[in-house]
A protein has these predicted regions:
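Signature of N-terminal electron-transfer/Fe-S-associated modules in redox systems
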Residues: 1-134
Length: 134
């Protein structure tokens, strides 16, 4: 599938950010969302452009590092999944996908789609926890 991407680019928390348009081509429906971003970044690097910065760690739906807003929804169109569990089969050929970082004062942008999660980490280090009804 061929997709248009509108990705939030921002140098740091104090810089003015903006959406930048990209295209990716021949993406398999079985590709994960983060793999699609990897494909875009490989293309950008080949063209001597700066890759899009985004967080990820386990890529197994465990750690929560990959949190993004996709088309205005946390983690994308599905519910009860993380961004790394989202696959491109949830989109249609020719779709435009808008990708943004979390918009929260507690999580300022480090760069592009990566945010500073230290406020959350401090809660965990202090012995606190965050619970979610499941």
């Amino acid at each position: 599938m061929n997709l248009k991407l509108k990705i939030w680019r921002q140098q740091n928390a104090h810089a003015q950010g903006k959406f930048v348009d990209y295209t990716v081509e021949n993406i398999s429906p079985d590709t994960s969302f983060l793999e699609m971003l990897d494909i875009l970044n490989n293309k950008l690097i080949q063209n001597n452009e700066e890759p899009v910065v985004f967080d990820h760690d386990c890529r197994e739906g465990i750690c929560g590092m990959c949190s993004l807003h996709i088309n205005g929804h946390a983690h994308g169109p599905d519910t009860d999944i993380t961004t790394c569990q989202l696959h491109m089969r949830k989109f249609k050929d020719g779709d435009t996908i808008t990708i943004e970082p979390w918009r929260s004062r507690a999580f300022p942008v480090i760069k592009d789609l990566a945010v500073d999660r230290s406020a959350y980490d401090k809660i965990l280090q202090a012995g606190g926890f965050i619970s979610v009804n499941t």
